[in-house]
């Protein structure tokens, strides 16, 4: 496992020369995905903090950020995609799959470009940028699905909430990474 302070921009530092190391890596990624899914499902049961559709903390994104810094881009994408799909299935919100994917993939693309350049001590900044991009991606999906730009009026509230929730999830992800044993 890589150290949290030295992110690899690609697929992490794991070399899969042995079946054991490959199995261990897959097991660790499956556990991270399960934790992300649990956080997503628990958060889905919490009443909204504000009366604005789409505003939530994004607790599952803590795990995506941790995966970026421990395993790299490719594995972070896999954890994200599996969590989004299974989260939609298990929560019974298959109609929200498009919005989750559009927000998640836009956020991922921006974070994948930026995370090698943002040190762990500023993970909160990457998380804030990612949260804002997630909200922009969801608004773009809503415009396409609804065929109107009227939903753009949600954007200011979503951007503000993205900054706040992104800062929170980034600080938590940074604290998690700081407490993991160094490899």
Predicted regions and their residues:
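Hydrophobic transmembrane alpha-helices
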Residues: 17-66
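Alpha-helical transmembrane segments and their cytosolic interface
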Residues: 2-33, 38, 153-183
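Generic transmembrane alpha-helix motif of multi-pass integral membrane proteins
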Residues: 59-73, 110-115
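Transmembrane alpha-helical segments of multi-pass membrane transport proteins and ion-pumping complexes
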Residues: 37-41, 88, 104, 108-112, ...
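Membrane-embedded alpha-helical hairpins and interfacial helices in multi-pass inner-membrane proteins
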Residues: 53, 93, 97-98, 116-183
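Short helix-perturbing small/polar motifs within transmembrane alpha-helices
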Residues: 27-32, 38, 79, 100-133
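Interfacial aromatic-anchored transmembrane helix boundaries in multi-pass membrane proteins
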Residues: 40-57, 82-112, 145-150, 154-155
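Residue-level signature of transmembrane alpha-helical entry/exit and packing/kink sites
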Residues: 21-32, 57, 61, 76, ...
């Amino acid at each position: 496992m890589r150290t949290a302070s030295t992110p690899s921009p690609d697929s992490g530092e794991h070399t899969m020369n042995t079946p054991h190391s490959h199995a261990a890596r897959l097991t660790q990624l499956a556990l991270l995905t399960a934790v992300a899914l649990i956080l997503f499902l628990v958060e889905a049961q919490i009443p909204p903090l504000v009366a604005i559709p789409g505003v939530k903390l994004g607790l599952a994104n803590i795990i995506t950020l941790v995966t970026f810094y421990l395993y790299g881009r490719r594995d972070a994408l896999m954890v994200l995609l599996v969590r989004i799909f299974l989260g939609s299935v298990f929560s019974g919100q298959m109609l929200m799959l498009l919005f989750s994917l559009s927000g998640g993939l836009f956020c991922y693309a921006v974070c994948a470009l930026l995370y090698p350049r943002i040190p762990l001590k500023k993970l909160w900044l990457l998380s804030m940028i990612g949260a804002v991009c997630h909200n922009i991606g969801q608004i773009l999906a809503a415009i396409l699905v609804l065929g109107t730009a009227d939903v753009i009026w949600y954007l200011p509230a979503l951007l503000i909430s993205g900054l706040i929730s992104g800062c929170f999830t980034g600080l938590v992800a940074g604290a998690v990474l700081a407490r993991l044993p160094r490899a």
